[in-house]
């Protein structure tokens, strides 16, 4: 048995992970999202615009016999293609045509995996994705742009088998004050600014 500890940040004190639930437009589609980084989970817990406190739930995942897709082991283009499957960086017809071709070329079939592991995305990285698809960003510096600052690694629970191997440690429940968000996470990130400035210089 191989166990890893993961955290889920949410405004909800009570959470029941359920197979088939979740938003299609999240980074890796429907699923239950967790991270090994407790600080990242705290950010998730209080990142909504409503001034409410949040919660970090602690889980243990038995990864024995689970098929895990780790995007860190693949080219960053495969990760971008996965994001494009679920989240639109632009609404233009040209972007939709180009992104479809990009997905066909670099995408990975994730349907057979129990868990997807990889970087999380934010607004600055979707800006870069949009510019890359438009051929405004050179491949040689794409990874450098995407490594500006720590994105954080997330796990997305996808299959019924993976859900069955996920157990909450209720004694590990942590309350997160909303003030933490104001002090630590709310300011415009340096990462976002640098990503934007660098892409503008290309």
Question: Which residues fall in each region the model found?
Answer:
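Short His-Asn-centered micro-motif
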Residues: 8-10, 34-36
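Conserved small/polar residues in nucleotide/adenosyl-binding loops
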Residues: 191-198
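ADP-ribosyltransferase catalytic core
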Residues: 2, 18-30, 36-97
């Amino acid at each position: 048995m191989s166990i890893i500890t993961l955290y889920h940040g949410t405004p909800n004190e009570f959470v029941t992970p359920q197979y088939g639930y979740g938003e299609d437009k999240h980074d890796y589609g429907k699923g239950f999202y967790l991270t090994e980084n407790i600080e990242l989970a705290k950010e998730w817990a209080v990142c909504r615009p409503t001034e409410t406190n949040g919660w970090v739930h602690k889980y243990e995942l038995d990864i024995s016999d689970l098929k895990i897709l780790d995007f860190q082991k693949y080219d960053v283009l495969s990760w971008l293609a996965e994001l494009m499957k679920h989240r639109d960086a632009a609404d233009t017809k040209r972007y939709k045509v180009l992104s479809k071709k990009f997905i066909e070329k670099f995408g990975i079939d994730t349907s057979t995996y129990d868990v997807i592991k990889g970087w999380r995305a934010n607004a600055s990285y979707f800006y870069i994705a949009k510019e890359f698809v438009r051929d405004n960003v050179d491949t040689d510096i794409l990874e450098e742009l995407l490594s500006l600052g720590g994105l954080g690694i997330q796990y997305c629970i996808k299959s019924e088998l993976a859900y069955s191997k996920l157990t909450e440690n209720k004694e590990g429940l942590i309350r997160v004050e909303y003030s933490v968000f104001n002090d630590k996470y709310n300011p415009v990130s340096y990462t976002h600014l640098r990503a934007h400035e660098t892409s503008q210089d290309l």
